[in-house]
Amino acid sequence: MSFASDCKDEASTIKDMPGHCKMASLEAMLRLNSEIVRTNGHFIITFLSANSHVAVYFMRLIKDLYDAQMELLTKEATKFLKKKTYEVVINSQCETIINDMNLFLNESPNHLDYESRECCKKSYLRGAFLARGSVNDPARSDYHLEIATRNNIEAIYIQRLMNSFDLNAKISKRRNDIIIYIKEIASITDFLRIIGVSQMVFKLEELQIQREFKNDLNRKVNSEIANGFKTLDAANQQLANIQCLEYNYPLEKMDPKILLIMKVRKDHPDSSFKELLEILNNDYGENITKSG
């Protein structure tokens, strides 16, 4: 499972919402990833997702708000369809849903109602992310979270919602899609917190602590080799970071090299980074380079 899928799985578990927040999430999902067709004089709405939890979440919203008849279809992966896909087909109440949300129009008066409530803004962003959002694995250094749409008015609206939370969201074009994206790790963390995925926020923050610890160690090692002095304040900061990791993060999931560095630092709290390098090399056979 990818980090983005895990985020969507957690967001799909959120149930305790008032009706107006459910409407906000549902409208976002319909606007970004649904298709409306007319068959034998009746409308049918379909919603597609590669995530089963998202499909079930969508069905729950429809059931709670409209008690409509639905069916869930599964499409297996093929060479043309890269992932297994879940299709929700709404067979009743479609005209009511379409009229309530003005889905045949490029813009909806409901948008103004959502903006008047912070809870609805968060719910709309949650629905948009579930429908067509993605986020890079935080283990990578190229931080990126995005929501895609094919409607320019919708893109501007989503950007406005995101930036009402100071996320510095920007818009770009990619083939047939308009992309609303954020790049800063702090903004990505805030966005995930806004849509309610607290467990994934915790995981993201722990990975950040690990990366900062390792990067800080490498910087200090290089500084010690170049300048030949030891900084006690830096060592104390390293010990504080180690204590934070040991208290908050499952150590069995950490890189063994990081665990070894943490142990050596705790065993030698007053040693310079140059001295730590020698201990790691002589006692443990670990050669730490500039790249770690």
Language model regions located:
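Sequence-level preference for short, compositionally simple segments enriched
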Residues: 1-43, 50-54, 72-82, 106, ...
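Short charge-dense sequence patches
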Residues: 1-15, 103-114, 143-144, 208-213, ...
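Short acidic, hydrophobic short linear motifs in intrinsically disordered regions
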Residues: 36-45, 140-141, 272-278
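Generic amphipathic alpha-helical segments used as scaffolds and interaction surfaces in large
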Residues: 45, 49, 115, 145-149, ...
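DNA-contacting interfaces and partner/effector-binding or oligomerization modules
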Residues: 49, 53-56, 60-207
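Extended mid-to-C-terminal alpha-helical interaction segments
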Residues: 196-290
